[in-house]
């Protein structure tokens, strides 16, 4: 599903532990790291997509996490021209994302990247909250900055 402006609706997931660190996932067979994210199907709400993607990409269930916050609006990024599939219709030029800040309330051993036939990640680690800003691919950096900045007060206020 792509909107009239060419952006695919998507959810981004910032999963935190009790130390305030965030889950940072390595894309399969790449030296590229990112937060889990995924598309919203036509019959889903952003929250429905969050739980589906959380299970598909990280192996966690609804009961394993607590939603702390969600971004107020959609945050958009454009894909670099080399990643735009110019022969696909409708044309997708980027993603528009709702970001969710979650707290892991179960044991971290529940995190599994290999529960689907086509896993997106092959590794993960806990990193400091702001660490991803200097590590994520350049075209996603501004969206990460905006999401982390908007959601940071909720992480600090969680206790």
UniProtKB/Swiss-Prot annotation:
Motif Nudix box mapped to chain: 38-59
HAMAP family (alphabetical): Nudix_RppH
Keywords: Hydrolase, Metal-binding
Signal peptide: none
Recorded GO CC terms: cytoplasm
Cofactor(s) the protein needs: a divalent metal cation
Any GO BP annotation: mRNA catabolic process
Family under the similarity heading: Belongs to the Nudix hydrolase family. RppH subfamily.
Domain of life where this protein originates: Bacteria
Underlying gene: rppH
GO molecular function, one term: mRNA 5'-diphosphatase activity
Disulfide bridge positions per record: none
SUPFAM superfamilies xrefs: Nudix
Enzyme Commission number: 3.6.1.-
This protein's name: RNA pyrophosphohydrolase
Function (record text): Accelerates the degradation of transcripts by removing pyrophosphate from the 5'-end of triphosphorylated RNA, leading to a more labile monophosphorylated state that can stimulate subsequent ribonuclease cleavage.
Protein source organism: Pseudomonas fluorescens (strain SBW25)
Start and end residues of each Nudix hydrolase domain: 6-149
Lineage: Bacteria, Pseudomonadati, Pseudomonadota, Gammaproteobacteria, Pseudomonadales
InterPro entries to which the protein is assigned, alphabetical: Nudix_hydrolase, NUDIX_hydrolase-like_dom_sf, NUDIX_hydrolase_CS, NUDIX_hydrolase_dom, RppH
